[in-house]
Amino acid sequence: LNKIKISAVSYTNTKPFIYGIEHSALLDQIDLSLDIPTDCAAKLIDGQVDIGLIPVAAIPHVPNANIVADYCIGSVGAVNSVFIFSKVPVAEIKTVRLDSQSRTSNNLAKVLLKFHFKQAVSYVTDEPIDADAIVLIGDRTFGRRDDFPFAYDMGEEWMNFTGLPFVYAAWVANKAIPQGFINDFNQALAFGLSKRKELLLDLPKLDNFDLEDYLLHKLDFELTDKKREALALFLSYIAKL
């Protein structure tokens, strides 16, 4: 039997899913790789993998894209790991440096700045350029909030803007996946989520970041109807950028 190739994100927010997959009978049926979000998306788009936990902004670029899990990386309001960090208040932001690791967060920043904050901003991607603000996501944001005079949590700002939760990444396939596998996969993800407290014991303690609050409360992993609505709305805003 051909193994199903899966690319998942290497960040802490995905560890419950990985835990569930690694403690399930699926291990014999899959090839699992851990990547940064942009690489998860690239592998799925290029057909190097069958399923990926991909930044949602990449979904329109995936051939035959279909969401195969009832779980996602999401939040209802503040998420505490997807930020616009700024030297100036948002009304004064003129230049923003984007994050090379995620298309979704860059697009979310653009959508919020244009439609929510009504700011005309120019975007740069090069490290050396000194911008007013930067987009930063994932583990690289842990404990960084105090390094900047202004921090805008994009999950919180999206909620302020739309009244909806947000989906940062979803489990997407680029082909039809057998329903039996999908059922087992969802069970594995649910099991991993149920073991978050145990998982925390194995994670390194961070002085300046509350991992327990992050994994148990800030992140919201169920792909609800409201999150699906938010996803469709977000993709429609990206199309208007």
Regions found by a protein language model. Name each.
Residues 1-241:
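Domain-level signature for soluble enzymes in the chorismate/prephenate branch of the shikimate pathway
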